[in-house]
Curated annotation (Swiss-Prot):
The keyword Electron transport is assigned to this record: no
Superkingdom classification of source: Bacteria
Gene of this entry: ureA
Matches recorded under PANTHER family: UREASE (PTHR33569:SF1)
A GO BP entry: urea catabolic process
Pfam families assigned: Urease_gamma (PF00547)
Family, as annotated: Belongs to the urease gamma subunit family.
Cell compartment(s), UniProt: Cytoplasm
Alphabetized InterPro entries for the sequence: Urease_gamma (IPR012010), Urease_gamma/gamma-beta_su (IPR002026), Urease_gamma_sf (IPR036463), Urease_subunit (IPR050069)
Taxonomic placement: Bacteria, Bacillati, Actinomycetota, Actinomycetes, Micrococcales
Gene Ontology CC terms, in alphabetical order: cytoplasm
Name of this protein: Urease subunit gamma
EC nos: 3.5.1.5
CDD domains, A to Z: Urease_gamma
Amino acid sequence: MHLLPREQEKLMIVVAADLARRRQARGLKLNYPEAVAIISYELIEGARDGRTVAELMSYGTTLLRREDVMEGVPEMIHDVQIEATFPDGTKLVTVHNPIR
């Protein structure tokens, strides 16, 4: 199987998000890469499901709370930006201050 760099990156996000969800299910607080992976994965999948950019920008702020992550992580993540594939093409989705 040959994957393009963009496809490899998406696959890495899926794997990282899966690992983060498993750790979260064990009661662990998420670190920076884990939190970004979960948010990124949900945005990519939301685009695939047909949600709009505006819907995803709003949805991205509901995925994780301060209680879900290690101390200091919310302050480290100012924006999460993902190029996602929508039915009408690829678009940039930006979520500002995703962990509240």
